[in-house]
Every structure is written in structure tokens, then in C-alpha cells.
Amino acid sequence: MNREADFLQQLGQDRLIASIKSPKNLEQFLETEIQAAFLLTGNISVIKRYVDLLKQHNRTVFLHVEKIPGISYDREGLKFLAKFVKPTGIVTTKSSLINYAKQEGLVAIQRLFLVDTDAVAQGLKTVQDIKPDALELMPGLIPEMIEKVV
């Protein structure tokens, strides 16, 4: 199975993904049964250590690229992540990074902010054009908007 299929199967079993925003949250996460995490903390000097720790505990790890200082938001930044840090994938608001991530074998999750009807329309167009592996819809508590995307 490939990374995307593994992730989707896991998501079907455990519908929660933790959002780790500080090193303290990292330790708290490891005490839970949740299997997947979005990592929004760290920097280029510690991020591999964080990812390795999570993977040692058999967790699925996605890096929010824009939240990791020192990682460039381009093809070379994604190559670095894929070759040296080795997360399961990335989360990004930047559509340009989705294809780069997929080319490097990373699962690519597009984060969309659905704040008004224009954002919904633009988000749907982006998803059709870019074809990310999965979507994170923000704000998180918007069930009526989910029907429009699905």
C-alpha cells in the first residue's frame, strides 16, 4: 500500500487528527490513542527529531510547512523534508506546494479557509485544479460547508 492509501485507511478508523502546537503538546499527544498529528511547532534544527520521535511511536506525521521556520516554501524545501525529515506528508495553504509534495512521495493535504462564499468558490476551483490527497477545512466546525465540498 502507498502512503496515501495507508493514511486514508487509518483516517477511516480514527477520525481524529491532533494539532501539535508546542513541544509540550508533543508529549501530551504521545499519551493519547490518536494515531495522526499535524505538527505546527519546531524549526529546521529540531523538526527531524520531532518527526522521528512520533514515528518511533508508530504515529502518522504531517508537517504544516508554513509553521516550521527555516523550511522554504518551494520545491527544494519539499525535497529536503521528503529526503531528510521523512514525515508522512504535509499540510499547507499554498496550492503550489501540493504537486511538489506529491512528486516527492509525500501525502499532500490542502488547508482551506472557508470564510465566505467567495472563499468556498475559490477553494473548490483550487481543489479541482490541484487535486490534493485530502483537505483540511477551516474553521473546523463547519458541517454545513462540508456538504458543499463533498
Q: What are these language model-derived features?
A:
Residues 18-30, 74-78, 118-128:
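Short, acidic/polar
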Residues 1-63, 69-71, 86-87:
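Conserved N-terminal beta1-alpha1 strand-loop-helix module at the mouth
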Residues 37-39, 110, 134-137:
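Short catalytic-loop micro-motif centered on adjacent basic/acidic residues
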Residues 76-84, 88:
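Glycine-rich loop/turn
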Residues 32, 84-85, 104, 129-130:
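Structural motif
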Residues 41-57, 70-75, 92-106, 115-123, ...:
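Active-site-adjacent beta->alpha loops and helix N-cap segments on the catalytic face
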Residues 29, 94, 135:
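Conserved, mostly hydrophobic/aromatic
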